Amino acid sequence: MKLTAISGGAVFLSGLTRLSHAASGNGAAAGYNEAPAQTKSSVRAEDRVFITNEDSNTLTVIDPRTNTVESTINLTSFDEDARPPFRFVTAGVAPTHAAMIHKPLYHGCIDAHGAVPSPDGKLLATSGRGSSNIYLIDAVNKRVIGNIPNPSSGPTTNPERLTSGILVGREPHEPTFTRNGKELWVTLRGEDRIAILDVARAVKQVGGTDADAILRYVPTINGPAQAWFNAQGTIAFVASQKTSKVDVFSVNADKSGHSHPERIITLDISAQDKPGFTPFLKTSPDGNEVWFSHKLSDAVSCRATSGTFDILDTVPLGNLARPNHVEFVQNAKGKVVYASLARVDDGGPDGVASSQIAIIDRSVKTGTRKVVSTFFTHAREAHGLWTNPENDLLYVAHEQDELPGTPNAGQTVCTVFDVSDPLNPQFITHIPLGSLKLPSGELRNKKSINLVYVRPGYRGQTA
């Protein structure tokens, strides 16, 4: 992909419109040790950022007051027993991330991937793609719900034994809570159905009670990637990574708040996504739009959330941009949607290769939206991103490790931006994710996927 440098140090995708919103923190001249631009006065003591790490099967917990790693939540089963087959490090040798899940007697998570907060921010659901299950996380106490005391606990073993979570089906990609928090919808990307769980029962079941947490399976399009709900919680949109379609369901909640889904329509989105590979979607804060990330089409699109769900905008992102998640930021200085781009570009800050985020101005008339600017994420293969409730901070997760010769060489990092001016983001810092310290050795946190900013007790983005 050809890059073009412009005044102000910003670098934009060839063929995209240039605007004069180039920030000194965005371009090739921007340093890694740039002073923080955000006072962080909006951050509260209870705020935390959670990141799923797919290769290490861990969740990183970041304290946004200090932008440092507070803890790592363990979804592996290593070191529950002192005997060699149960250990992470055996005879002084640590396995590779790819090999560790094949060790004998491993019963932990495989491919920790999706993560989403409950409407009140007190609960997280995360999916194990390879282990075909869902785990529930207490977001207040930062612990896995359902773990039990380890009968083999001791100086060289873990104090807890990992729960099995809830087995739901093949390739659970993304879990999503209904707006009332009563249910969890899990898209089974390896199948053609959605698992719908009762949240209260699920909390009991992960602790070992046979609570029949799975209420039903709903047939849908092949390869469902993610479900998301309109603002009222009455309509669900389901995207696919195997077909150029979007399923739209009426939730039909009963008096108890539980759903009885009925398909309204299956939309043909081949004009926007001919390859049929749409991994993520999200509704706008005003509830009027739903935005889709078409990864292999290198585009995002927007549809109305009511009526006949008409297409409102299709926004190309450039050759091989490979968009992942979208996120909305709206405050006194602007109204945008960001799209994280997996592609890694040369010529990033300090000359180091970096991914970028596309900025789309949502304040303009529908049908005219386009990329107005991009900014470097200061790390490689951007994936999950989430803003804080005040919409003045943005956290970005990355899949690839940092390159040799860089300040955080060999580490997976999260990066932080001041987005108090959404059209002019300012880089704040890198956060190296470090390691999970197991009794037998350190397991490095690796390959970050989803990221969520959580304020327990606050009605968040899923409310």
Show which residues each predicted segment covers.
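Solenoidal tandem-repeat scaffolds enriched in leucines and small polar residues
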Residues: K182-R303, I311
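Short loop/turn segments immediately following beta-strands, especially the blade-tip
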Residues: T66, V140-R143, D198-G207, F249-H258, ...
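Beta-propeller fold detector
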Residues: E70-F86, I145-S152, T156-E160, V206-P219, ...
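Short loop/turn segments immediately following the C-termini of beta-strands
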Residues: E54, R129, R189, Q241, ...
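Beta-rich, blade/repeat-based domains predominating
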Residues: A28-A45, F78-P119, P151-R179, P219-Q232, ...
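Short, conserved, GDST-rich strand-edge loop motifs in beta-rich repeat architectures
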Residues: P36-V43, S340-A353, A397-V413
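N-terminal export signals
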Residues: M1-S20
